[in-house]
Amino acid sequence: MSTSKYPSEIKINPNKGGKAAIERLVEAYGFTTRQALADHLEVSKSTLANRYLRDTFPADWIIQCALETGTSLKWLTTGQGLKQSSLTVATEELPKFRLTAGKMIEDGSYVFDSSFLPANLSSPIVIQDGLVTYICDQKFSEVLDGHWLINIDGTYSIRKITKLPKGMIKITTTENSFECAFSDIEVVACIRSTIVSN
């Protein structure tokens, strides 16, 4: 049975792991040599070499590096986990709406890692419909075949739109489909990404 008081407790031996940690410091700063690291830390080459050869753990340098570069303290210390701290990853907060009985209900916001979001979003929102989450864009140049957030007589829903000749469209749901004039509906947003929860 574990006697650890903390779920993420890490045991650090001050006399072990120094070589690997110093190599991670070089990588985190973007240097190519340990000499460049020594110059940046304003320590002599012999001081750094001594810690490296004795495998002495450089806790003070690791803290400095984490503060200066935003590199994950866990990665610098152990080499495990993500190199970049979650605190420095670019994020974007999007307004969230929930579809309930055909109504769009404001429901806070979601924060996403920016790299997760589709490119070129101009006016993004998140729509939650049951177990499905949609990342949508309210700004679009034209309506093409695909899935859209639409408003029909005050009822909002996610539907597949297929353009037909003479200003007509086909609207498809999982249960049925029908045709109507494009002018009969309001297209609110384009569905750019779909996330399904189990």
UniProtKB/Swiss-Prot annotation:
Keywords: Transposable element. Gene3D superfamilies: lambda repressor-like DNA-binding domains, Umud Fragment, subunit A. GO terms for biological process: negative regulation of DNA-templated transcription; protein complex oligomerization. InterPro entries: Lambda_DNA-bd_dom_sf, Phage_CI_C, Phage_CI_N. It holds the Pfam family Phage_CI_repr. The keyword Transmembrane does not apply. One of its GO terms (molecular function) is DNA binding. The keyword Glycosyltransferase does not apply. Belongs to the CI repressor protein family. This is Protein ORFi in retron Ec67. It comes from Escherichia coli.
